[in-house]
Amino acid sequence: MTYKVLHIGAGGFGERWCDTFLPQNVADGTIEVVGLVDIDAKALDIGRKHLGLKAEQCFTAAAQAFQMVDADFCTIVIPPALHEGIVDLALARGMHILSEKPIADTMEASVRIAEKVRKSGLNMGVTMSHRFDQDKSTLRALVGADAIGRVNTVSCRFAGDFRLYDSWGRFRHEMMHPMLIEGAVHHLDIMADLAGAPCTSIYARTWKPEWADYKGDTDAIVLMDFANGAHGVYEGSSAQATGLNDWAFEYVRVEGESGTAILDHREIEVFHRYPMRLRQASRQGKGQQVSLLPGRKWQNALLIEQFCQWLDSGPPMATNVWENLQSVALVFSAIESVRLGQPVKVQEFLQSYRVGASIE
């Protein structure tokens, strides 16, 4: 079945959806884009051309689009603070929802959205694109196949040069916690996935160097404990001097009982322990190289396909809104840890919001 889609957000990263992710799924008949919304007329026109839409299929007001467009689901690619209003419009029209991360800009709103969707009986997925990129998927398959034994630690480094104003999208430069909400939301999610268990405790420190043109903190160090005994260390910066590990070129290392797997700049290598040796030493670049998994679609293009398979009565996608609350909880419990200056118990933090969720 080909599903009809109303897409919300053509500017910024929304343009990537319009010129790459959506067209890949239009080309193979997975979806048909039947409407487009953006408050910026210029971005709207660029998106319209990418998608081959008619002028009457494009709108600057979301409410009007939801009234006039007949679609099976909507895709949301706008700032997190605006997500809930679009979710409400979609649910009122009986549309399923596929949204960019995070679910919302607060823990309370994220849980509220998940509850609204659950009560509606409709489906909502969240596009954790980096977990489903080709390199991270290969690393996940490697670790999941027990190539390095039981996981002990997961380390991740993101270092991007977005220090100048508007280099990372204007709204991020105006946020209080841009690194955690817009950056670490992906990386902590990947780390929990590789650890193979929910995060139980998180301790975070954030700051902003004087050369970073942001209102909020651009740098973060995060320590994580997982339910299976694994541990995690995260280092993130959007104000690094040279873009050493920019988007899609992160450094990730998984230490296991019998080996080490390293992902660096989209290249993966594995080091194995030789049990007959008393001790051994290794060096990055000298390990066993691992080829990336083959595939036609990755990142959000793949997640759109998975969402449609879910609508076709397949199993819920891994990043369905209810499961994705775990990823959101990582971010907002980290923010709470920054506020308190001490570790936060993640599952208790999440449960406190679930209990207190208020749906009118």
UniProtKB/Swiss-Prot annotation:
Entries under InterPro entries matching the protein: Gfo/Idh/MocA-like_OxRdtase_C, Gfo/Idh/MocA-like_OxRdtase_N, Gfo/Idh/MocA_Oxidoreductases, NAD(P)-bd_dom_sf
Keyword vocabulary terms for this entry: NAD, Oxidoreductase, Plasmid
Recorded superkingdom: Bacteria
GO molecular function: nucleotide binding; oxidoreductase activity
Oxidoreductase in keyword set: yes
A Pfam family that the UniProt record links to this protein: GFO_IDH_MocA
Residues bound to NAD(+): 4-22
Intrachain disulfide bonds: none
UniProt function note: Could be a NAD-dependent oxidoreductase.
Protein name: Uncharacterized protein y4oX
Organism: Sinorhizobium fredii (strain NBRC 101917 / NGR234)
